[in-house]
């Protein structure tokens, strides 16, 4: 008897979760489809952006130079500069040390000097083959 009740509750939970997802995707439009562009549309939007300086490829933001391009998700990413003048965006470290990386003006300067913490210092060491 208890097994049957548990089975029924489990089945109802799974069915209701799937139904909720279906309804949410159908009636809220699942915004992701509206944001998708074909390669031609993307190229056309970038070519007609009106940017007279440098258009960042990841964010379509107009900046003075490529080194000023922001990461696509600045609240959760660090922009780390490479020795060749380019940059790479990586996820900010999590856990207890995450507060050290809250300020985007200084977070790229921090090096925890710990290969278990992936920050810009780690990227520099990896570039040199030290990791």
From Swiss-Prot:
InterPro entries: LCL2. Residues 1-17 form the signal peptide. One of its GO terms (biological process) is ERAD pathway. The keyword Signal applies. The keyword Signal applies. Keywords: Signal. It comes from the Eukaryota. CDD domains: LCL2-like (cd23996). Probable component of the endoplasmic reticulum-associated degradation (ERAD) pathway. Belongs to the LCL2 family. This is Long chronological lifespan protein 2. It comes from Debaryomyces hansenii (strain ATCC 36239 / CBS 767 / BCRC 21394 / JCM 1990 / NBRC 0083 / IGC 2968) (Yeast).
